[in-house]
Amino acid sequence: MAHKKGASSSRNGRDSAAQRLGVKRFGGQIVKAGEIIVRQRGTKFHPGTGVGRGGDDTLFAKQAGAVEFGIKRGRKTVNIVAAGQAAD
């Protein structure tokens, strides 16, 4: 077997950069409209009230308020509780 492969071949690719996925704002944190809450592949978390979903499944705040994680019908959901209701 040859140790040298030829003029134009490469010696394996290199490691790719991480995608920086995950939860960016945790439960109880205050967010403004447009802030990213979760970066994900697929819908590990589903959008609830006050939360939108981008084309790459990123969840973002549609309104200002406190982030709230919960479970609805067996799915993990993310909601935004308006600032006035957060004290309840």
Curated annotation (Swiss-Prot):
An example Gene Ontology CC term for this record: cytosolic large ribosomal subunit
Molecular function, one GO term: structural constituent of ribosome
Keyword line: Ribonucleoprotein, Ribosomal protein
NCBIfam families, alphabetized: L27
Record protein name field: Large ribosomal subunit protein bL27
Taxonomic lineage: Bacteria, Bacillati, Actinomycetota, Actinomycetes, Mycobacteriales
SUPFAM superfamilies tied to this protein: Ribosomal L27 protein-like (SSF110324)
Residue numbers spanned by region Disordered: 1-21
BP-aspect Gene Ontology terms: translation
Family the entry assigns: Belongs to the bacterial ribosomal protein bL27 family.
Highest taxon above the source species: Bacteria
